Amino acid sequence: IHLHWYEYPPMNPMMYPLLLIFMLFTGILCLAGNFVTIWVFMNTKSLRTPANLLVVNLAMSDFLMMFTMFPPMMVTCYYHTWTLGPTFCQVYAFLGNLCGCASIWTMVFITFDRYNVIVKGVAGEPLSTKKASLWILTIWVLSTTWCMAPFFGWNHYVPEGNLTGCGTDYLSEDILSRSYLYVYSTWVYFLPLAITIYCYVFIIKAVAAHEKGMRDQAKKMGIKSLRNEEAQKTSAECRLAKIAMTTVALWFIAWTPYLLINWVGMFARSYLSPVYTIWGYVFAKANAVYNPIVYAIS
């Protein structure tokens, strides 16, 4: 445990039952939602498409994250401290990082596939089962390789300040440890966010151009619209814009707190108390709950 955390008194005992209730609620919703997503997609023949393999992979990574992290969190919240030993602390942090990284990059590939279909259209190469499987394999191999690095001295997995979980060491002043967090932030936050925004900007532009083309064609044909009245009220352009805004907003809400905790820990640790460290994984784990809704349903 870093000496920084000894500067603070123990957390209010009421925080632990509140966190336990939140984790219980989140854990049940996440496991149930992602299990149903996996079961429906794997048992419905019409849904077993290459693109939906990515959705299933997202559900699996979110399910595994909560399945491996939910029970230890319940135990540590009950005892008000980490009681599972240093080895499991590292395993716990590794699994959390691995599943989180896999989820993030699966979302990126889902977005890229939508970009390929909508923006490039017939000019784009259609996603095959082989290609989707290769993407999924690449996601897990790279995520595993990246998250194994702290076991070999590039940063470390240590207890969080609230002592209910473990994660990367963002309080170390060692340049090697910090370099890992710089690359980590780029790999799992800035780059995926940039790709997501880029893809959705061009998706919205492409759909807007298509909508304009349909309106122009309707004028040439001397009719008000090629769509019926109900479809006009909720045009594809508006629906897609809402999905894009929701996706980017939820991404930002889910992962920004954890990023800020890491960077504040590196550069302004005096502002970082044990209570604040809770919010990072609270928002990140909530992401695993609404992913099935955002990606499977949309």
Curated annotation (Swiss-Prot):
**PROSITE patterns assigned to the protein according to its UniProt record, in alphabetical order:** G_PROTEIN_RECEP_F1_1, G_PROTEIN_RECEP_F1_2, OPSIN
Q: Which residues carry this modification: N6-(retinylidene)lysine?
A: 285
Record topology, Extracellular segments: 1-15, 76-89, 153-179, 265-275
The residue ranges for the Cytoplasmic side of the membrane come to 41-52, 113-131, 202-242
GO molecular function ontology, one term from the record: photoreceptor activity
Where in the sequence does glycosylation occur per the annotation?
A: 162
Parts of the chain that traverse the membrane? 16-40, 53-75, 90-112, 132-152, 180-201, 243-264, 276-297
Kindly state which keywords UniProt assigns to this record, in alphabetical order: Cell membrane, Cell projection, Chromophore, Disulfide bond, G-protein coupled receptor, Glycoprotein, Membrane, Phosphoprotein, Photoreceptor protein, Receptor, Retinal protein, Sensory transduction, Transducer, Transmembrane, Transmembrane helix, Vision
Which Pfam family is an annotated match for this chain, by its short name? 7tm_1
Which GO BP terms sit in this record? Answer: phototransduction; visual perception
- List S-S links within the chain: 89-166
Question: Topology with regard to the membrane?
Answer: Multi-pass membrane protein
Where in or outside the cell? Cell projection, Rhabdomere membrane
Q: Does the keyword Phosphoprotein apply?
A: yes
Q: How is it modified after translation?
A: Contains one covalently linked retinal chromophore.
Record-stated family? Belongs to the G-protein coupled receptor 1 family. Opsin subfamily.
Could you describe the subunit structure of this protein? Homodimer. Interacts with GNAQ.
What job does this protein perform?
Answer: Photoreceptor required for image-forming vision at low light intensity. Can use both retinal and 3-dehydroretinal as visual pigment. Light-induced isomerization of 11-cis to all-trans retinal triggers a conformational change that activates signaling via G-proteins. Signaling via GNAQ probably mediates the activation of phospholipase C.
This one is known as: Rhodopsin
Write down the species: Procambarus orcinus
Gene symbol of the encoding locus: RHO
